[in-house]
């Protein structure tokens, strides 16, 4: 008779060992955890220990034991009841079924609830079938919505019915794990062909990883709108919190998190080699090499490596341009080097480190051009659903959308209503009541969808005594406000107040800078036990006596506000500030900004920070971009007060084919110096802007409903496809541009195809006028439900903005596309034709 299976037999020893290490480091925190573990079954206790052994310290401080118990109990139940789960390799089960954290989201109980909701729908299914079905359930419950950077918990995404892609994928991964399907989030940290990033989901079945779009169900795996986009990525990564690293190429760490290279599943790749040498030409061992892509007009890291004894670092990446920088500290001095490498044509490059303070020595300050090439469109995942599968999927997606829209219609967080409707029985509570709406108003839209009434109640109760000591706006924003940065909103004021005597509180009010001195003595930073983007709450810092530098800064603001001192993190640089004599003053002495940079805009370019230009300072061998979002040019001039040092200005012109024309300006500015620089944007020739993209076949309808293949419409020569949204300004604008150049466009009228939703659109004033002037334009019809999205994504323009205009040259061969409002599109179309 076969021996009974033992839960986590292979990993039991190392789990116990790592758990004991965590408990040894945080004995005060783990004492009550150990007591609760004794009441659990052996399997559940071991599962809990795994979570505690490999979670960031911030999780230990931020959440009670009961939150993690939900994940452990659900994981053990799956292992006991589902043979597929029990048959998983233990490392797959631990990391991708049991583990509670996906990325940097808030953690809340959800797994048991999700399993109860989904379980009956996947009975008898294998992992592949279950993954597809779970994604339909996810689409019924949530969809995409652009929000701020704080990442919601999975249960909050479920409740509010939407989230950005990082939140949709957190939600979907948790849904999959809740029913035993191994799942993880993967990221394109920055695209190379456009200014953005994207996250989606991978599931493990039949011994390998497959992908799917979160809340974007298909009838097959390895299919999503991003399939083509991912083939143009220079990096796609996953992350693992365990110290036992799965097979794969490590491309960096973020504290206790390891990043793994997943690009080979999505794109054509190659291995490149970077050699770093010192000034004498000798190999530099241990140099940090950063691989970066130009995105939002700054060089953004996508992978980091350290050089070996030969001074080399290797990376598997895509076939496009990388900005590669290297840094190293020797005897307290930082050395730096950088270059741009086109990996399509080059296999290796060499960097020679120089002291960063001499970065610009001997160089005349001037603009230097850099051509940045995006990888070509070359998808390696080409599976497509059959026509029957596509029809079935469309029907199911329509039903899912209807279910979700009904669910979220008029939804609001009941906790907000509970907070507003609390009965007022005392005079003090009557005063507080007048501030209830103010407190909710100062929160973000996202905060109002997942805040908890009891948490807000404590902040209101303990802040009200200070309401008459300052202006109302100051009190509401910088004392009453429970939000400091992107931390989890929790109670902390009562916990903070009990740590100080009456005399100590008054001393800290008299000199708020002393709060930071206390924090520095009491709270230690353990970056190797953290994830930099996961914040320890003020209460968590106090409980664990640990926290990152950012977490400690948030704690400073929390303590100050608890004591009635108006405080904040500066919105530009996150520096700690408190109010003194009506203005915010810094807690830590800043480096004096005793230099002035005068930037001249020129006449023709509209400069937008982090869109077509940025400026970065070189410190500690790394360029860090300045945060200038609120700064604007006035009369073509922008005055920037700067610290002395070495800087780099980047300008970038993104072309329709995804490539970029970049300009770099390196300069040094001395104390007291004023320097003038005129920003220069490189212009593109027509041939630089074109692409050859094979579009999928699609059907349009004639006036009588006859279907016509797009391949037939685009077969001979060049054509202009225009999907129009009548009587909306962007469509009206291009129609007016065409009529202003009536004679020129009339020569191409037979090659222009207008696509509208209905015959009534043709009767609207501007469109009917355009058709009267350009008599031979072809008219076709579509409901815009699917084709717009497919073509927009395929041509790498925003499918949510109309009109969608595509120029073709030959059968289904797109050479240019634009969407939305763009001045000068008419001129561009004439140039292309």
What are these regions (language model features)?
Residues 768-802:
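Short, internal strand/loop/helix patches
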């Amino acid at each position: 008779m076969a021996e009974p299976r033992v839960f986590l037999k292979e990993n039991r020893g190392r789990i116990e060992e790592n758990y004991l290490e965590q408990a040894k480091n945080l004995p005060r925190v783990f004492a009550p955890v150990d007591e609760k573990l004794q009441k659990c079954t052996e399997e559940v206790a071991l599962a809990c220990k795994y979570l505690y052994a490999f979670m960031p310290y911030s999780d230990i401080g931020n959440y009670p034991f009961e939150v993690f118990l939900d994940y452990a109990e659900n994981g053990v139940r799956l292992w006991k009841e589902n043979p597929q789960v029990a048959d998983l390799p233990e490392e797959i089960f631990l990391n991708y079924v049991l583990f509670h954290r996906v990325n940097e989201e808030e953690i809340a109980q959800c797994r048991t609830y999700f399993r109860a909701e989904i379980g009956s729908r996947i009975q008898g299914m294998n992992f592949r079938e279950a993954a597809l079905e779970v994604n339909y359930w996810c689409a019924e419950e949530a969809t995409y919505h652009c929000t701020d950077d704080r990442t919601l918990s999975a249960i909050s995404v479920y409740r509010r019915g939407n989230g950005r892609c990082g939140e949709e994928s957190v939600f979907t991964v948790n849904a999959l794990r809740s029913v035993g399907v191994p799942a993880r989030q993967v990221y394109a940290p920055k695209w190379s062909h456009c200014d953005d990033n994207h996250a989606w989901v991978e599931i493990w079945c039949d011994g390998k990883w497959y992908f799917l779009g979160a809340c974007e169900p298909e009838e097959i795996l390895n299919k999503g709108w991003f399939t083509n986009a991912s083939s143009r990525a220079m990096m796609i990564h996953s992350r693992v919190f365990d110290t036992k690293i799965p097979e794969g190429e490590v491309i960096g760490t973020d504290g206790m998190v390891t990043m793994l290279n997943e690009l080979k599943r999505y794109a054509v790749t190659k291995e490149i080699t970077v050699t770093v040498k010192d000034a004498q030409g000798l190999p530099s061992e241990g140099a940090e090499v950063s691989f970066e892509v130009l995105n939002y007009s700054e060089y953004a890291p996508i992978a980091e490596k350290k050089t070996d004894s030969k001074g080399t670092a290797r990376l598997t990446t895509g076939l496009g341009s990388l900005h590669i920088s290297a840094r190293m500290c020797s005897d307290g001095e930082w050395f730096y080097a950088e270059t741009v490498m086109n990996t399509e044509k080059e296999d290796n490059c060499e960097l020679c480190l120089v002291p960063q303070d001499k970065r610009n020595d001997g160089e005349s300050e001037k603009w230097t051009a850099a051509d940045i090439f995006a990888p070509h469109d070359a998808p390696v995942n080409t599976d497509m659903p059959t026509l029957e599968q596509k029809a079935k999927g469309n029907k199911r997606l329509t039903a899912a959308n209807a279910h979700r829209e009904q669910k979220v219609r008029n939804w609001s967080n009941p906790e907000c209503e509970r907070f507003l409707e609390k009965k007022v029985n005392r005079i003090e509570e009557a005063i507080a009541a007048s501030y209830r709406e103010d407190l909710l108003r100062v929160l973000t839209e996202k905060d109002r969808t997942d805040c908890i009434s009891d948490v807000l109640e404590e902040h209101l109760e303990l802040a009200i005594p200070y309401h008459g000591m300052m202006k109302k706006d100051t009190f509401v924003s910088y004392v009453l406000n429970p939000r400091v940065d992107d931390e989890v909103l929790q109670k902390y004021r009562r916990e903070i107040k009990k740590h100080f005597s009456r005399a100590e509180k008054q001393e800290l009010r008299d000199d708020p800078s002393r709060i930071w001195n206390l924090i520095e003595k009491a709270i230690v930073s353990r970056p190797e036990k953290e994830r930099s983007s996961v914040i320890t709450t003020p209460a968590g810092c106090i409980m664990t006596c640990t926290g990152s530098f950012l977490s400690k800064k948030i704690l400073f603001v929390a303590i100050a506000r608890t004591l009635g001192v108006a405080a904040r993190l500066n919105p530009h640089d996150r520096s700690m500030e408190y109010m003194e004599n009506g203005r915010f003053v810094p807690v830590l002495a800043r480096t004096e900004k005793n230099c002035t940079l005068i930037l001249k805009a020129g006449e023709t370019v509209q400069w937008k920070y982090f869109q077509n230009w940025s400026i970065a300072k070189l410190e500690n061998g790394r360029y860090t971009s300045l945060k200038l979002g609120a700064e604007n040019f006035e009369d073509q001039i922008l005055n920037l007060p700067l610290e002395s040092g070495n800087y780099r200005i980047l300008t970038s012109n993104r072309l329709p084919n995804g490539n970029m024309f970049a300009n770099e300006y390196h300069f040094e500015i001395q104390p007291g110096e004023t320097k003038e620089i005129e920003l220069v944007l490189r212009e593109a020739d027509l041939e630089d802007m074109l692409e050859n993209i094979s579009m999928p076949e699609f059907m349009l309808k004639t006036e009588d409903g006859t279907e016509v293949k797009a391949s037939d419409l685009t077969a001979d020569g060049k054509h202009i496809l225009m999907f129009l949204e009548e009587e909306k300004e962007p469509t009206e604008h291009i129609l007016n541009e065409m009529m202003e150049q009536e004679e020129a466009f009339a020569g191409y009228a037979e090659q222009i195809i207008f696509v509208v939703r209905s015959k009534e659109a043709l009767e609207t004033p501007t469109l009917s006028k355009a058709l009267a002037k350009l008599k031979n334009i072809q008219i076709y019809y579509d409901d815009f439900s699917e084709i717009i999205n497919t073509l927009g994504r395929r041509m790498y323009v925003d499918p949510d903005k109309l009109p969608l205009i595509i120029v073709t040259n030959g059968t289904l061969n797109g050479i240019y596309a634009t969407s939305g409002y763009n001045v000068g599109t008419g001129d561009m179309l004439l140039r292309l034709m």
